[in-house]
Each structure stands twice: as C-alpha cells, then as structure tokens.
C-alpha cells in the first residue's frame, strides 16, 4: 500500500524557509552559527589572499626581467610592413572629382596626419642630422634617454606637402597624393649602408598602362638612413616616421587601378607570399570623372 505524503501548505513552506534563513532557537543563519560563518569566511580570505600574493609575486619577478624601454623578445617578422595614407577601408582610394565630399574626407585625414611634420614643430623637437648614415645613440653602460630624432620636414614632400595648395593634395584635380609609410621595427637596419627607396607599379599589365605617370617626394622615393635605427616608443619620444609621397598625374579615369608599392633595401624581403604586407603594400586607385 502506497502511503502518500501530506502535502505542505504554502504557509508551512514559507515558515520553513524563514526558519532556514534565521533559526531563533539555535541562533543559526542559513544553517550556520556565527562562529561557523566567521571560520569559513576567514578560510576563504586567507585562501584567496594567498593566491593573490602568489600571482603578484610571480608578476613582479617576471617584470624584473623586462625592460621598460626595449622588448626582450620581438616578433619573428623582422621585415617592416608598409601602409598608405589617407587611411581608407580596404585600402581603396576612390576620388570623385565633381563630388567634394568624396575626397574632402581624405584631405581632412591628411591635414591631421601631416600636422606633426610641420617645419616649425620639427625644428622645435628634432635634430638636423647628417644624411647618408645611421643616427646611432648607444647607451655605453649608461641609459641614454630619451633618444634624439632626426627632422622630417613637411616641405620635403614637395607638391604633396599640402602647404598653400589650392588643389588639396591634388584630389580636386584628379592628381591625388598617396603617402607611403613604413611600420616601425625596433633596431631595424636597412643594411649595406645604402638609403632605401620606394617603387610603385601597376600589378598587372593593364594596371601599369592605366596608372600613367607619377612623381615621388622626396626624389626617387628615397628614405634616408638617418631615420634609423628606431629605439622604441619610450626611448624615441619624438621620433618622426619618414614618408614617401606619390603624386599620380594622369591615371586613366573611371577605371580601377591596382597599385603595389615596395620598399627596396638590402635586407628587406618583399616576395614572402605568406605576408602580403612585408615590405610592400597593395591598394586600389580610382579617379571618377563625369
């Protein structure tokens, strides 16, 4: 014979819960006395305090082996990559000459990007260096901080400097300037004591034909050795990255042109198919005319 348990009323269930939370007869809170709660809280306090102390100690020991200025370990990729300015989505530089808004955003980005390169700012912060040789600043046992940097003046960008330029870097006339910059790599040397230079080509035969003529600033797209080596963000506080400006003069209008620019130096490999940005950058250029 099955004996059915008596079903508790709602009031009984509530009373049982109230007694579980606080039992006035045994002076227990949620099944434990005050002493029991004190011991268990003390245990967890000591336990997590010990874990925190161990973690803090290991972090402190690790940080003693790390320099504040130069990373102990660097990326296996020693070849600097290239990027373009103005910075655009998918590296597409599209200019509609008749639509001021389409190229106005590029002009605003370039104005902001080139502001630190103004000659007055460079003269105030950086040194006039001797071209053709590395600007090395060894510590020689004593921390040489901060490192000095060489001037890269905006006027070196010639027709792409944007100084007193009514064409807005050429975007209003369909002759846009695109700026090539090399990513920073700490203690990078170009090798062979020869200045680097940037070259740009159309990726395919039809691209080369549609690309037309272009000029580079500084001349021949050169990047002088005096801007190297780079010692890191904390060491080289006022470091100014050298730029190469490419002014495209007669791109075939209304056609998408695939352009690839490379940095040429003795120890920079630009043929690594696993990294499309190692020493090179590819972008699309389109000049729309109505």
Curated annotation (Swiss-Prot):
Sequence intervals crossing the membrane: 40-67
Disulfide partners: 129-150, 160-177, 200-261
Cytoplasmic side: 1-39
Region feature (immunoglobulin-like): 193-290
GO molecular function: ATPase activator activity; ATPase binding; protein-macromolecule adaptor activity; transporter activator activity
Keyword annotations from UniProtKB, A to Z: Cell adhesion, Cell membrane, Disulfide bond, Glycoprotein, Ion transport, Membrane, Potassium, Potassium transport, Signal-anchor, Sodium, Sodium transport, Sodium/potassium transport, Transmembrane, Transmembrane helix, Transport
Presence of keyword Zinc: no
Gene3D superfamilies attached to this UniProt entry: 1.20.5.170, Na, k-atpase alpha subunit (2.60.40.1660)
GO BP terms in the entry: cell-substrate adhesion; intracellular potassium ion homeostasis; intracellular sodium ion homeostasis; lateral ventricle development; membrane repolarization; motor behavior; negative regulation of glial cell migration; neuronal-glial interaction involved in hindbrain glial-mediated radial cell migration
Keyword NADP among UniProt keywords: no
An example Gene Ontology CC term for this record: apical plasma membrane
Family as reported in the entry's similarity comment: Belongs to the X(+)/potassium ATPases subunit beta family.
Subunit structure: The sodium/potassium-transporting ATPase is composed of a catalytic alpha subunit, an auxiliary non-catalytic beta subunit and an additional regulatory subunit. Interacts with isoform 2 of BSG.
Annotated domain remarks: The C-terminal lobe folds into an immunoglobulin-like domain and mediates cell adhesion properties.
Function: This is the non-catalytic component of the active enzyme, which catalyzes the hydrolysis of ATP coupled with the exchange of Na(+) and K(+) ions across the plasma membrane. The exact function of the beta-2 subunit is not known. Mediates cell adhesion of neurons and astrocytes, and promotes neurite outgrowth.
Name used for this protein in its record: Sodium/potassium-transporting ATPase subunit beta-2
Organism of this sequence: Mus musculus
